[in-house]
From Swiss-Prot:
EC class of the enzyme, as a word: ligase
UniProt GO molecular function: aminoacyl-tRNA deacylase activity; ATP binding; catalytic activity, acting on a protein; proline-tRNA ligase activity; transferase activity
InterPro entries recorded: aa-tRNA-synt_IIb, aa-tRNA-synth_II, aa-tRNA-synth_II/BPL/LPL, Anticodon-bd, Anticodon-bd_dom_sf, Pro-tRNA-ligase_IIa, Pro-tRNA-synth_IIa_bac-type, Pro-tRNA-Synthase_IIa_type1
One GO CC term on file: cytosol
Annotated GO biological process: prolyl-tRNA aminoacylation
Phylogenetic classification of the source organism: Bacteria, Bacillati, Bacillota, Bacilli, Lactobacillales
Family named by the database record: Belongs to the class-II aminoacyl-tRNA synthetase family. ProS type 1 subfamily.
EC number(s) reported in the record: 6.1.1.15
Underlying gene: proS
Name this protein carries in UniProt: Proline--tRNA ligase
Amino acid sequence: MKQSKLLIPTLREMPSDAQVISHALMVRAGYVRQVSAGIYAYLPLANRTIEKFKTIMREEFEKIGAVEMLAPALLTADLWRESGRYETYGEDLYKLKNRDNSDFILGPTHEETFTTLVRDAVKSYKQLPLNLYQIQSKYRDEKRPRNGLLRTREFIMKDGYSFHHNYEDLDVTYEDYRQAYEAIFTRAGLDFKGIIGDGGAMGGKDSQEFMAITPARTDLDRWVVLDKSIASMDDIPKEVLEDIKAELAAWMISGEDTIAYSTESSYAANLEMATNEYKPSSKVAAEDALAEVETPHCKTIDEVAAFLSVDETQTIKTLLFVADNEPVVALLVGNDHINTVKLKNYLAADFLEPASEEEARAFFGAGFGSLGPVNLAQGSRIVADRKVQNLTNAVAGANKDGFHMTGVNPGRDFQAEYVDIREVKEGEMSPDGHGVLQFARGIEVGHIFKLGTRYSDSMGATILDENGRTVPIVMGCYGIGVSRILSAVIEQHARLFVNKTPKGDYRYAWGINFPKELAPFDVHLITVNVKDQVAQDLTAKLEADLMAKGYDVLTDDRNERVGSKFSDSDLIGLPIRVTVGKKAAEGIVEIKIKATGDSIEVNAENLIETLEILTKEH
């Protein structure tokens, strides 16, 4: 395809509003353009990459018997009222009315629609299982769209739904999807982990997230590609090397979620769901009497600990939440942080929000900084992290401004429900006892759920089982963020390309090093001088030969300076660059492998054979 015929509006500079490298490069390389806040147009290059990813998905889903269909994006609100999500989904749901004043939504996901379609068509267990999916635009009214395609108001998603007559059958399909997702993301060239995930608004029970890992840009050998003019990093002057490190550091922010994983086992989980090895300890110290002490101007745990000369691990942090309009007290060891997802899941709450200062004062009789679990009103619900029950003679707020209590002992002085509600910390033991936890940043690219009967119960989707009994259909749900795949791939495959000019100056610029499977084209064929007829003829022949061998070819036929062509080529990021330059009359062309920066001159007649050898090596 001729580059002059495509819309590829590259920019000379990084966009000033971009915060992550994937967003910056997608805009600068002419892949996407923002139409309005959180809404993007996918230009030809991005669209080709997305279509290649769709092909990979379709091939893998066919292997597990998943069937593609297409549901509407505009949905009646009545279906969501049936499931109960119309009221509970939150402000992210796009709600609208038609000319008849009927309520509709723009679908952020399609559980209700697929459940209804199957409910109306399937009556017997003999018609199951069903395994359906679609690839479609979804809509979510994000309060603060950000990070390019990672947090948008319109996005492309693959959402699949399976329907079963029992949980054993669901387990089989769930495992099929897990393996299919691993195959898809592996083929897409992603470094990823399957981790324990949170079902969230989807209503799932068991779930697994697939996270594309986005490591820090500190390893020069990974993130920097040297031109053939530079033999090694050792040849780069120290001051230039420091500039390169600074450029990498400028784009260090990467990923949207933190994951915790074991250094010695397969354990991995989203930070929201991660836990650590816990060993209860028996109390050995005698319990002191409760005592009220004045702690003037002490509002935080560290201030209280310093004032009373105790370690923060001997203090109790007391928080108040409102869960579905009911107050809940949460307790932590003083140096720990609350994990609101764990707390919300334990409470099985639809809504969980921190209480306001006014609400806290009404409940405790004191303001923030002086709250504690002792002498609360009868019937108060207290949920404490499991570490709290190991404390002896702890310090907690006295529910009196400017005062705390010492000698606080769980069990004697208050009763609580003990459960894991804290955020894990790096370096703690993995919950399986093998290795310690390390943190990494990542981008969620896929999520699979065992929905069970969450939707079939609320929407009356039932079948007759083998015994003639009416039972709810058991469901699974399987999503892939198609548009965010583009961001994830670029986050992992962005590279800083460094070259040395004939005058000895060092220059560097960001570009993309697309994996072959997702690159919009396989080969970037560049004619240095489009006015040279010999070069033009050779380019045309090479283009035809490459296409005949199955290569997707982007031919740069523009009448532009060669420097601009090479800069655009680095930006666009195709795996192979073939340059028809000054030696065209001799039948000599240059091949450059983008991943390594290696280049070689070959006779044009040997181009295909050489490419086959080089691509096998890389």
